[in-house]
Amino acid sequence: MVLLIAGASHTGKTLLAQRLLERYRCPYLSIDHLKMGLIRSGRTALTAELWPILREMVKTAVENGQNLMVEGCYIPFDWKSSFEAQYLAHIRYVCLIMTERYIESHFGEIKTHADDVEHRLDDSGCTKEGLIADNTANLAQCRAHGCDYILIDGDYAVDITL
């Protein structure tokens, strides 16, 4: 089984994947690690090509009967169109989405928890307005494409059973 965990920046994708790794011993790939590897190796033009590479990695995991989680911001909302039925039967997708109300009332906590798993070098670009815009857009895209999502509106209690 492959689990795709999507969502805007700061929604807790990596933290969720880390918790699921610890609970189920299922490995995960952070798309940010792949992206940073490309950037640091001077291959910045390749960052736009992440989804085709990830898609083929997912197919390989399914073909080999391996469990894998892939988390990050670069999973397209029309991801299903990249796979035939025999693959889709083994892939789950969830997008983490924070409501405007949650962001408004918990922005300080969101910023505080930004480094729970990964150490961000510069988080100054994270603004309340940006988070609201990104999460609102993601919710609209999830609804338009019929994607499963977890709406974070009250207490932050994101969990998935594999």
Listing of model-derived features with the role each one plays in the protein:
Residues 48-98:
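Glycine-rich phosphate-binding loop used to anchor ATP phosphates in small-molecule kinases
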Residues 8-9:
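The conserved Walker
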Residues 91-137, 141:
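A glycine- and Lys/Arg-enriched "phosphate-lid" helix/loop adjacent to the NTP-binding pocket
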Residues 5:
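Hydrophobic anchor at the beta1->P-loop junction of P-loop NTPases
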Residues 136-162:
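NTP-dependent small-molecule kinase module
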